[in-house]
Protein backbone atom coordinates (compact mmCIF):
# COMPACT_ATOMS: atom_id res chain seq x y z
CA UNK A 1 0.00 0.00 0.00
CA UNK A 2 2.77 2.43 0.96
CA UNK A 3 4.66 1.58 -2.22
CA UNK A 4 1.53 2.31 -4.29
CA UNK A 5 1.02 5.66 -2.61
CA UNK A 6 4.67 6.55 -3.16
CA UNK A 7 4.42 5.63 -6.85
CA UNK A 8 1.27 7.72 -7.29
CA UNK A 9 2.91 10.69 -5.58
CA UNK A 10 5.98 10.47 -7.78
CA UNK A 11 3.91 10.13 -10.96
CA UNK A 12 1.66 13.03 -10.01
CA UNK A 13 4.67 15.21 -9.16
CA UNK A 14 6.39 14.47 -12.49
CA UNK A 15 3.19 15.16 -14.43
CA UNK A 16 2.69 18.37 -12.46
CA UNK A 17 6.23 19.50 -13.22
CA UNK A 18 5.78 18.89 -16.95
CA UNK A 19 2.43 20.70 -16.99
CA UNK A 20 3.90 23.65 -15.06
CA UNK A 21 6.66 24.08 -17.62
CA UNK A 22 4.13 24.42 -20.45
CA UNK A 23 2.00 26.77 -18.34
CA UNK A 24 4.79 29.33 -18.44
CA UNK A 25 4.21 29.87 -22.17
CA UNK A 26 0.46 30.31 -21.69
CA UNK A 27 1.06 32.83 -18.90
CA UNK A 28 3.57 34.75 -21.01
CA UNK A 29 1.15 34.82 -23.94
CA UNK A 30 -1.60 36.29 -21.76
CA UNK A 31 0.74 39.02 -20.49
CA UNK A 32 1.95 39.91 -24.00
CA UNK A 33 -1.56 40.00 -25.47
CA UNK A 34 -2.82 42.13 -22.59
CA UNK A 35 0.06 44.59 -22.69
CA UNK A 36 -0.21 45.03 -26.45
CA UNK A 37 -3.96 45.62 -26.40
CA UNK A 38 -4.29 47.85 -23.34
CA UNK A 39 -1.25 50.03 -23.96
CA UNK A 40 -3.02 51.50 -27.00
CA UNK A 41 -6.20 52.61 -25.25
CA UNK A 42 -5.10 55.57 -23.15
CA UNK A 43 -6.21 56.62 -19.66
CA UNK A 44 -8.68 54.16 -18.12
CA UNK A 45 -10.76 53.64 -15.00
CA UNK A 46 -11.45 50.12 -13.72
CA UNK A 47 -14.92 49.43 -12.38
CA UNK A 48 -15.37 46.36 -10.18
CA UNK A 49 -18.55 44.77 -8.82
CA UNK A 50 -20.83 41.78 -8.65
CA UNK A 51 -21.68 39.62 -11.64
CA UNK A 52 -25.03 38.92 -9.95
CA UNK A 53 -26.46 42.45 -9.98
CA UNK A 54 -29.58 42.52 -12.15
CA UNK A 55 -30.67 45.13 -14.70
CA UNK A 56 -33.24 47.48 -13.23
CA UNK A 57 -31.62 47.56 -9.79
CA UNK A 58 -30.15 50.66 -8.15
CA UNK A 59 -26.52 49.63 -8.39
CA UNK A 60 -26.86 48.46 -12.00
CA UNK A 61 -28.24 51.86 -13.00
CA UNK A 62 -25.63 53.67 -10.93
CA UNK A 63 -22.78 51.70 -12.50
CA UNK A 64 -24.09 52.53 -15.95
CA UNK A 65 -24.29 56.22 -15.07
CA UNK A 66 -20.82 56.35 -13.50
CA UNK A 67 -19.26 54.69 -16.55
CA UNK A 68 -21.12 56.98 -18.93
CA UNK A 69 -19.91 60.10 -17.16
CA UNK A 70 -16.32 58.89 -16.89
CA UNK A 71 -16.39 58.02 -20.59
CA UNK A 72 -17.61 61.52 -21.42
CA UNK A 73 -14.54 62.82 -19.58
CA UNK A 74 -12.32 60.82 -21.92
CA UNK A 75 -11.54 57.73 -19.85
CA UNK A 76 -11.69 54.22 -21.19
CA UNK A 77 -13.61 51.86 -18.91
CA UNK A 78 -12.19 48.49 -17.91
CA UNK A 79 -14.39 45.79 -16.38
CA UNK A 80 -14.20 42.06 -15.86
CA UNK A 81 -16.30 41.66 -18.98
CA UNK A 82 -19.10 39.62 -17.43
CA UNK A 83 -22.73 40.29 -16.44
CA UNK A 84 -24.09 42.41 -13.60
CA UNK A 85 -22.10 45.49 -12.60
CA UNK A 86 -19.59 44.76 -15.34
CA UNK A 87 -22.26 44.72 -18.02
CA UNK A 88 -23.78 47.93 -16.68
CA UNK A 89 -20.44 49.74 -16.78
CA UNK A 90 -19.66 48.55 -20.30
CA UNK A 91 -23.16 49.54 -21.39
CA UNK A 92 -22.77 53.06 -20.00
CA UNK A 93 -19.47 53.36 -21.82
CA UNK A 94 -20.98 52.33 -25.16
CA UNK A 95 -23.86 54.79 -24.71
CA UNK A 96 -21.26 57.54 -24.35
CA UNK A 97 -19.30 56.29 -27.37
CA UNK A 98 -16.39 55.55 -25.07
CA UNK A 99 -13.73 52.86 -25.06
CA UNK A 100 -15.31 49.75 -23.55
CA UNK A 101 -12.82 47.13 -22.33
CA UNK A 102 -13.61 43.66 -20.98
CA UNK A 103 -11.09 41.40 -19.26
CA UNK A 104 -13.02 38.15 -19.26
CA UNK A 105 -11.99 35.15 -17.16
CA UNK A 106 -12.73 31.55 -18.10
CA UNK A 107 -14.65 29.94 -15.22
CA UNK A 108 -16.47 26.61 -14.93
CA UNK A 109 -19.80 28.21 -13.90
CA UNK A 110 -19.62 31.69 -15.41
CA UNK A 111 -19.03 33.92 -17.32
CA UNK A 112 -19.69 34.73 -20.92
CA UNK A 113 -18.67 38.20 -22.08
CA UNK A 114 -21.43 40.79 -22.05
CA UNK A 115 -22.66 42.43 -25.25
CA UNK A 116 -21.28 45.92 -24.57
CA UNK A 117 -17.56 45.36 -25.02
CA UNK A 118 -15.72 46.71 -28.06
CA UNK A 119 -14.77 43.68 -30.15
CA UNK A 120 -11.12 44.73 -30.34
CA UNK A 121 -11.00 45.33 -26.58
CA UNK A 122 -12.21 41.96 -25.32
CA UNK A 123 -9.46 39.87 -23.76
CA UNK A 124 -9.87 36.38 -22.33
CA UNK A 125 -7.78 35.05 -19.45
CA UNK A 126 -7.23 31.72 -17.77
CA UNK A 127 -5.23 33.18 -14.89
CA UNK A 128 -6.65 35.57 -12.33
CA UNK A 129 -3.25 37.00 -11.43
CA UNK A 130 -2.49 38.00 -15.04
CA UNK A 131 -5.92 39.58 -15.33
CA UNK A 132 -5.38 41.59 -12.13
CA UNK A 133 -2.12 42.98 -13.48
CA UNK A 134 -4.04 44.28 -16.50
CA UNK A 135 -6.66 45.94 -14.29
CA UNK A 136 -4.08 47.71 -12.19
CA UNK A 137 -1.31 48.54 -14.68
CA UNK A 138 -3.52 50.48 -17.07
CA UNK A 139 -5.90 52.26 -14.68
CA UNK A 140 -5.74 55.80 -13.36
CA UNK A 141 -8.48 55.17 -10.82
CA UNK A 142 -10.76 52.50 -9.41
CA UNK A 143 -14.49 52.32 -8.68
CA UNK A 144 -15.60 49.54 -6.33
CA UNK A 145 -19.30 48.78 -6.61
CA UNK A 146 -20.97 46.26 -4.27
CA UNK A 147 -19.76 42.75 -4.98
CA UNK A 148 -18.65 39.44 -3.55
CA UNK A 149 -15.35 37.68 -2.92
CA UNK A 150 -13.96 38.67 -6.31
CA UNK A 151 -14.64 42.36 -5.71
CA UNK A 152 -13.10 42.17 -2.24
CA UNK A 153 -10.06 40.46 -3.73
CA UNK A 154 -9.69 43.26 -6.25
CA UNK A 155 -10.19 45.94 -3.58
CA UNK A 156 -7.54 44.52 -1.28
CA UNK A 157 -5.17 43.94 -4.21
CA UNK A 158 -5.31 47.60 -5.18
CA UNK A 159 -5.18 49.02 -1.65
CA UNK A 160 -2.19 46.78 -0.83
CA UNK A 161 -0.29 47.94 -3.92
CA UNK A 162 -0.89 51.57 -2.96
CA UNK A 163 -0.13 51.03 0.74
CA UNK A 164 3.17 49.31 -0.05
CA UNK A 165 4.05 52.01 -2.60
CA UNK A 166 4.24 49.56 -5.46
CA UNK A 167 1.66 51.88 -6.98
CA UNK A 168 1.38 55.63 -6.93
CA UNK A 169 -1.61 56.85 -4.96
CA UNK A 170 -4.64 57.27 -7.18
CA UNK A 171 -8.39 57.68 -6.67
CA UNK A 172 -10.17 54.63 -5.28
CA UNK A 173 -13.87 54.99 -4.55
CA UNK A 174 -16.19 52.52 -2.82
CA UNK A 175 -19.77 53.18 -3.94
CA UNK A 176 -22.57 52.43 -1.48
CA UNK A 177 -22.05 53.51 2.13
CA UNK A 178 -24.59 51.07 3.50
CA UNK A 179 -22.98 48.15 1.67
CA UNK A 180 -19.37 48.92 2.58
CA UNK A 181 -19.79 50.32 6.09
CA UNK A 182 -19.54 46.92 7.80
CA UNK A 183 -16.15 46.32 6.20
CA UNK A 184 -14.94 49.79 7.17
CA UNK A 185 -16.10 49.26 10.74
CA UNK A 186 -14.06 46.04 10.89
CA UNK A 187 -10.99 47.76 9.48
CA UNK A 188 -11.31 50.52 12.09
CA UNK A 189 -12.40 48.47 15.10
CA UNK A 190 -10.24 45.38 14.59
CA UNK A 191 -7.34 45.84 12.18
CA UNK A 192 -6.53 49.39 13.29
CA UNK A 193 -6.99 48.65 16.99
CA UNK A 194 -4.76 45.56 16.71
CA UNK A 195 -2.09 47.70 15.07
CA UNK A 196 -2.13 45.82 11.77
CA UNK A 197 -2.79 48.96 9.71
CA UNK A 198 -2.06 52.65 10.27
CA UNK A 199 -4.68 55.42 10.47
CA UNK A 200 -3.42 56.87 7.18
CA UNK A 201 -4.16 53.56 5.44
CA UNK A 202 -7.86 54.30 5.86
CA UNK A 203 -7.38 57.44 3.77
CA UNK A 204 -6.28 55.44 0.73
CA UNK A 205 -9.91 55.13 -0.39
CA UNK A 206 -13.18 57.02 -0.12
CA UNK A 207 -16.76 55.82 0.41
CA UNK A 208 -19.56 57.59 -1.44
CA UNK A 209 -23.22 57.14 -2.33
Protein language model regions, located:
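Glycine-rich beta-alpha loop segments
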Residues: 10-103
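Residue-level signal for short, function-critical loop segments
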Residues: 51-53, 147-148, 178
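Glycine-rich, charge-decorated loop segments at or immediately adjacent to ligand/cofactor-binding or catalytic sites
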Residues: 84-91, 180-192
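Acidic/glycine-enriched connector segments
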Residues: 84-144
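Short, acidic/small-residue loops that bind anionic groups at enzyme active sites
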Residues: 99-110, 145, 159-186, 199-200
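Short, conserved catalytic or adaptor-binding loops enriched in Gly and charged residues
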Residues: 114-117, 194-201
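Active-site/ligand-binding-proximal alpha/beta "capping" segment
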Residues: 126-175
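A charged, well-structured terminal subsegment
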Residues: 137, 141, 198-209
Amino acid sequence: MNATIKTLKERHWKESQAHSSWQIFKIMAEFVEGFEALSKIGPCISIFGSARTKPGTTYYALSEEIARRLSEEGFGIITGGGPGIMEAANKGTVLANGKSVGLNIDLPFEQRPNDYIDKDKLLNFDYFFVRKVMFTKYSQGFVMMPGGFGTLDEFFEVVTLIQTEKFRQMPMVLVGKKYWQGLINWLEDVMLVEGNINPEDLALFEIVD
